[in-house]
A protein has these predicted regions:
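Conserved nucleotide-sugar donor-binding subdomain of glycosyltransferases
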Residues: 73-116
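C-terminal amphipathic helix plus adjacent low-complexity
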Residues: 329-360
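A nucleotide-sugar donor-handling region in carbohydrate enzymes
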Residues: 126, 131-137, 142-214, 239-242
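Conserved nucleotide-sugar phosphate-binding/catalytic loop shared by glycosyltransferases and other
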Residues: 3-6, 13, 31-81, 253
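Donor-nucleotide binding loops and adjacent catalytic segments primarily
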Residues: 26, 169, 184-272
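A short, glycine/small-residue-rich beta-strand->loop->alpha-helix junction that serves as a flexible
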Residues: 11-23, 215-217
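A donor-sugar binding/catalytic signature common to diverse glycosyltransferases
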Residues: 262-305
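Short amphipathic alpha-helix
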Residues: 19-29, 44
Length: 360
């Protein structure tokens, strides 16, 4: 369907989630005969290059976002907002300069509004059609919709039925005319006949830490302190792809990063999973059919909203970072039984068929 078409896949570089959720998309492009080119930098590029070592790549730098140590991110984000706008303009100019050299037929951008061109089919993948922001939300939502309209297509990573996983973020009264749902995107798949099914879980707790500093490290320190007082073996995945050495602190194994299949097995072979309430993580949990203790990043509007949403749906246990209690969470079960959801559904195949039509 896409035989020989050179398609750039460019994830946003705020943490690793945007890169990891591009993995199943890249796999599907390869299956359809396309030639994906990876467009990323630093951690996201390290993740994608590890998953696809033979693929061509190009470095596309982005802005480094830092969160405040306090729970109030308003002033921190406001100070960085002008740099974010400049970054969008810079990456647009950079992309136009490299487009011809890369001999691209199309581009798929994960939340990078500057990675598009009027000269070739440009697709945006997102779950943030109607984003939550700490200030001027109605104005910024209009700006977001205007940016979405500049792409030929907008693929929404969520279930069609509201509230889905993203709730109001992806289900509004009126969706953009160029949008369609493609289901969840996750590099995870259910592990059949895992050791935990017959002999008990290998790990009591598997914690997957992610996101910008300093909040990533703050959560790491809280979890490590509490885990040392809980019997059993625990695993902490630090969300640091450049950290190659495995470390052991008492009953806790610490590793910088794990590829999808290994992480899926570890998560499936645990009594409890702990993670942020980032959207990519929620898609991974849905693909595995696992609940988790989710901890929103303090002051991160979207994660706090998703925490509130799923405290109500009963899919997950939700605790705030300043009141994490792992012992209590271990004794709690989520209200709603979960069934693994298939990632890379027929909806994605239909969207790729539409892309093939644009390329004719």
């Amino acid at each position: 369907m896409l035989n020989g078409k050179r398609i750039l896949v460019a994830p946003l570089d705020w943490g690793l989630g945007h890169a990891t959720r591009c993995v199943p998309l890249i796999e599907r492009l390869l299956r359809f005969g396309a030639i994906p080119i990876l467009g990323a930098d630093k951690g996201p590029l390290a993740v994608l290059s590890a998953e696809f070592p033979s693929l061509e790549y190009v470095r596309i730098p982005g802005i480094t976002v830092r969160y405040s140590e306090s729970g109030n991110q308003l002033w921190s984000m406001a100070k960085q907002f002008p740099a974010m706008l400049r970054s969008m303009q810079t990456e647009r100019a950079l992309f136009e300069g490299m487009r011809a050299k890369l001999r691209l037929d199309a581009v798929i951008s994960d939340q990078r509004f500057g990675i598009r061109s009027n000269a070739l089919p440009s697709l945006l993948i997102t779950h943030q059609v109607f984003p939550f922001t700490p200030f001027a939300q109605s104005v910024l939502r209009k700006v977001n919709l205007r940016n979405i309209a500049r792409f030929d297509r907008c693929w929404i990573m969520d279930e069609q039925r509201s509230p889905g996983l993203a709730g109001e973020l992806s289900h509004g009264a009126e969706l953009p005319g160029n949008s369609r749902y493609i289901g969840i995107l996750s590099r995870m798949a259910p592990i059949r006949n895992s050791p935990s099914e017959s002999t008990g879980a290998k790990y009591r707790i598997v914690a997957v830490i992610s996101g910008p500093e300093p909040q990533r490290s703050l959560l790491e320190n809280i979890l490590l302190e509490q885990m040392q007082g809980i019997k059993g073996e625990h695993l902490v995945v630090l969300g640091l792809p450049d950290e190659l050495d495995q470390k052991q602190i008492k009953n806790i194994t610490m590793i910088g990063h794990m590829q999808g299949s290994k992480l899926a097995r570890a998560m499936s072979d645990s009594e409890m999973i702990v993670s942020r309430s980032g959207y990519t993580t929620l898609m991974d949990l849905a693909a595995l059919g696992r609940s988790a203790l989710i901890v929103p990043t303090p002051g991160q509007e979207e994660q706090e909203y998703l925490g509130r949403l799923h405290a109500g749906t009963g899919r997950y246990i939700v605790q705030q970072q300043n009141s994490i209690d792992l012992t209590t969470a271990l004794g709690t079960t989520a209200d709603q039984p979960l069934t693994p959801q298939h990632s890379g559904s027929d909806l994605l195949d239909e969207a790729l068929g539409d892309l093939a039509g644009l390329l004719q």
